Amino acid sequence: MPRKRSKPPEGSAFDAGLRLIAMRDHSSWEIRQKLLKRGHPEADVAAAEARLIEMGFLGDRGFAFQYVRRRSRTHGLLAISAELAAKRVDRETAEAALARVEPHAQVLAAHRLAHRLAGNTEFGSYRELLHKVGARLLRRGFPMDVARAACKDLWRGTPEEAEA
């Protein structure tokens, strides 16, 4: 439900939608919510959304593919899937976008991120490294096996590696 405003929104819902899309890609649901929040009438928002889709400026499929491509550099597929669901992208579209990410690319992203998260910290044991860096990778949506592989790469061959 749109919030009450003291004055009507400036410009058309279509123009406002174009400005939003010019800043970054949005899902259809996000555009709809933002336009309603800015006080545009429901009918104008629906017409603007339909026109943006018709002109090719708005579409959940394109949004999902771009979103996955951008976020997969720093997040695992589990987190990205949850984010797409929160943006109301349908499951089939989200799964198609997520399927395009190569497993090797996820492993490389986790390795790069693990190096960045560890920084210059010297860990006393592999378990400590796994506890601190591995846990952060898990929170970012990487699977356990990928987080462990990234941590093992950081640790590289010390005797405690066998403990894990």
Named regions from a protein language model:
Residues 1-164:
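An alpha-helical, amphipathic repeat domain used for nucleic-acid recognition
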